[in-house]
Amino acid sequence: MQFGPVPLDQAEGAILAHSVPLPNGRLRKGCRIGPEEIATLRGIGLSDVIVARLGPQDVHEDAAARTIAEALVAGQTAGLDLRPVGTGRVNIHVAEAGVVGVDAARVNALNAVDPMVTLATVPRWQRLAAGEMAATVKVIAYGVASASVAAAALAGQGALTLHPPRLRTAALIQTVTPEDDGGSGHRAIESRLQALQVALQ
């Protein structure tokens, strides 16, 4: 990937590296520079701009993040949702309550592939309610080598799984004493089960 200042007449098709303040807002970093953006930049008196330009073996940050995120949930037919990609980031949320399985060895292997590719997850067996986030894939640069994308996807394949509860009701057996009627323990267990959409009978 090439990175640095270029004259405006050479900037078309490149990626804007830094946000540029405008009288009525700003031109956001990461946007693809076209004729309209060049005209806007000229209009505020700029003659050059700092850009990133992907090489033939580079993958755009959004496409790279999506490819890696899809590999993470490979084999998981339901339960893990990939949210829309943006600025090189894909958040992975759970579609239903459950506990998240995380293969730490695969996560560590993925994070060792390229410093421009990162994965963060909740702890293994974290209990999550429907809609909560389980992991984030982030490509830090505007683009990353296709070889790194392929290696990261392979390293992290199937690293995330969701395990929803198999039962929808549960019974609690408690030992109580005259000093403790078990109410606080009952409420604590009930709250944890409710987070998994399991009713305590």
Regions found by a protein language model. Give the residues of each.
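Residues in flexible loops and secondary-structure boundaries
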Residues: P23-N24, P35, V59, V100, ...
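Structured core elements
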Residues: I50, N91-H93, A171
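Short, low-complexity N-terminal leaders and the immediately following helix N-cap/first helix
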Residues: M1-T87
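Extended, charged alpha/beta regions that create polyanion-binding interfaces
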Residues: G55-L167
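Phosphate-binding glycine-rich loops and their immediate beta-loop-alpha structural context
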Residues: I140-Q201
